[in-house]
Design a protein with these regions (language model features):
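Surface-exposed peri-terminal alpha-helical interaction modules
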Residues: 1-110
Length: 110
């Protein structure tokens, strides 16, 4: 599987993670994208954006048999791409906040 950032994803590793762990990792990369966008560092924002897209793509592969999850991941990916390309920081913040619940939940249950 080719990736946008050039890194080779380990689909086997990602498929062993719980859904909460997967989403928490995605949240981290989206948070980095938002952070660099807010600091007007387009180069770093774009790198984080590409890494987030790679994570989205791996998660989509991991969830191809779970239609509802797959559909929501695809919608979220589309929304994330659109918000990034339009520099819609408000919507990127909403996406970041929505995904933060997975990271917080994961911390509580570990």
């Amino acid at each position: 599987m080719d990736t946008i950032s050039g890194r080779k994803p380990d689909i086997e590793h990602w498929s062993k993670l719980s859904f909460f762990e997967q989403m928490a990792n995605l949240y981290s990369e989206i948070g980095r994208t938002l952070k660099w966008k807010n600091k007007n560092n387009e180069e770093m924002a774009q790198k984080a954006f590409f890494r987030a897209l790679d994570i989205f793509d791996v998660l989509i592969v991991c969830h191809t048999k779970k239609y509802d999850t797959l559909r929501e991941l695809c919608r979220l990916r589309e929304n994330f791409c659109e918000s990034f390309m339009e520099s819609d920081l408000d919507n990127l913040s909403v996406i970041d906040k929505d995904l933060s619940h997975y990271a917080y939940s994961l911390r509580i249950h570990k």
